[in-house]
Structure formats: structure tokens, C-alpha cells
Amino acid sequence: MGPAEAGFGDYVALLKPRVMSLVVFTAFVGLWIAPQPVNPFVAFCAVLFIALGGGASGALNMWYDADIDAVMRRTAGRPVPSGRVTSQEPLAVGIALSGLSVMMLGAGGNWFAAGFLAFTIFFYAVVYTIWLKRSTPQNIVIGGAAGAFPPMIGWALPTGGIGIESLLMFALIFFWTPPHFWALALFMKDDYSKAGVPMLTVTHGRKVTRCHIFAYTLVLAPFALWLGFTSVGGPLYLAVSVVLNALFIAGGWQILRRSEDQAQADGYRVEKRYFRLSLYYTFLHFLALLVQHWVGGW
């Protein structure tokens, strides 16, 4: 099959729209709750350019990871390994969107935020995808910074800089990322092993991974709660964060106490439930920040 069989949806899929949706949302929240007001049209354009930058990162990742995507069940249906899109098209799309998104964000917003976006694209495409992902079990720990930068970019658009609030938003996503992906790796270990990706489950086993998941839930909680006591926090956000972190820690504790025999016996039911919870964890925190901004904080 050649590229002629590719549809519009295949090119959209190159941008990893599900991943991009969280990037867009967290960037928007960072922008909207910043202390300086921003014109709604400028905000819309800025978020669009950040989305294009996120899509560029996804396309470059699809280009470089085509070989391992073809091996893993979870990714074998993607446009490149399935043959619907040629291997070089994601590279062209990624480079074009990288340049466009950074230049437009700089021209329409500010060059500090644009430089931040350029660094984020570079970090995800080069530092994480090309270097870390295949070389160290800490791949998702260090590489997770790429997914944590968007709210800082959003914050930098109206403010032109960095604040404690944007650093804590970064920390929330940064420390959430490892347990989120390690939970997935607990029940997808064979896929990662077959593809030669040194996830923690592959290099150190599931027992060590369970310990790391629980440890990160404990590290994550203080940063999430601390955000509630800053200028963007308030009682509503804090209440949501307390509940979410209690559930996340309880889920991590359940995972820690499980034996591999128990997990295999019930098809990794607890691990899959924890993974689903992690999908909502970050979204609900940022939604709570947005609602708190509308109703007023402390």
C-alpha cells in the first residue's frame, strides 16, 4: 500500500490528536489563569499555534518511531507502520509545522513563549524520542518534561516570563507522567520488550515498577496541593485536588501490594483501573484551576 491510500484522517493521526488535546487544554488554562489579561482572539490564535507545535512533535515522533510502532500491538495501526503514509511524510509535516508554529507564536504573541515552544518541540522530538526512549528506563521520567511545558508556555504568553504558579503546573504534569505510563507498562510489558524499549518493567521488572509508581504518587501530591495555595488556587481547586490525590495514592498503594500472580489472575484489573484514573487526574486538576479562576480564588 502506498501513500495514495492515505485519507485526511491519517494525516490528522500523525499529529497524535489525543495527546495534543491535553497539550492544548493545559496550555489554554495556563494562559487564561495568568494574572495579565489577554485578548480572546490572541488567546485562540496562540493556543492554535501551540497545538500545531504539539502536532509537529507528534509527527516527528511518528517518523522516528515507525519501526517500533510496527512491532507493538498498541501502535501497529498507526498511519506509517500500516503503510497508509510513507515514512518520510511525517518528517516533512513535523518540520513544516515546527517552523510555522514557532514563527506565528512569536509574531502573534511573544518571542519568549515562542522560544519555549521551540525548545519543547526539540526536547520531545530529539531528547526524548531519538535519545532517551531507547536508551534508558528513565526515558519517561526525563522525557515527561516535554508534556509538562505547555502550561508554562501558555502562562508566558501574557506574562512574558515564569512564575511559581507555572512551575507548579509543570511539576504536576511532570511527576504525574511516570506513574501514568508505568501503569500502562505493567500490562503492556511484552509489547515494550518485543519492541526493545527499555521501560522500567522491562529492565527492572514489575515489582520494582510498582514501588516506583507508589513513590511518585507520594511525590506528586504535595505539588498538586501546593498549587491550591497560590494566586491561581482556592478552596474549590483544593477540594478537587485532595480527592484526586487521595484516590491516586490509594490506587498506587493497591498496585504496590499486588503480586504478579494476582495481577495475571484478574487480567491486571487494578492496574488498568489506575491507568484510567490517571487519564482523568491531570485533566480534572486543570479544569478545577479554570473553574476556580472563574469563581474567584482566595
UniProtKB/Swiss-Prot annotation:
CDD domains: PT_UbiA_Cox10. The keyword RNA-binding does not apply. One of its GO terms (cellular component) is plasma membrane. The chain crosses the membrane at residues 19-39, 40-60, 91-111, 112-132, 140-160, 167-187, 213-233, 236-256, 277-297. One of its GO terms (molecular function) is protoheme IX farnesyltransferase activity. It is an enzyme of class 2 (transferase). It is found in: Cell inner membrane. It is a multi-pass membrane protein. Its main location: membrane. Keywords: Cell inner membrane, Cell membrane, Heme biosynthesis, Membrane, Transferase, Transmembrane, Transmembrane helix. Pathway: Porphyrin-containing compound metabolism; heme O biosynthesis; heme O from protoheme: step 1/1. It comes from the Bacteria. The keyword Signal does not apply. GO terms for biological process: heme O biosynthetic process. Its EC number is 2.5.1.141. It catalyses: heme b + (2E,6E)-farnesyl diphosphate + H2O = Fe(II)-heme o + diphosphate. Carbon 2 of the heme B porphyrin ring is defined according to the Fischer nomenclature. Belongs to the UbiA prenyltransferase family. Protoheme IX farnesyltransferase subfamily. Interacts with CtaA. NCBIfam families: cyoE_ctaB, PRK04375.1-2. Converts heme B (protoheme IX) to heme O by substitution of the vinyl group on carbon 2 of heme B porphyrin ring with a hydroxyethyl farnesyl side group. This is Protoheme IX farnesyltransferase. It comes from Paracoccus denitrificans.
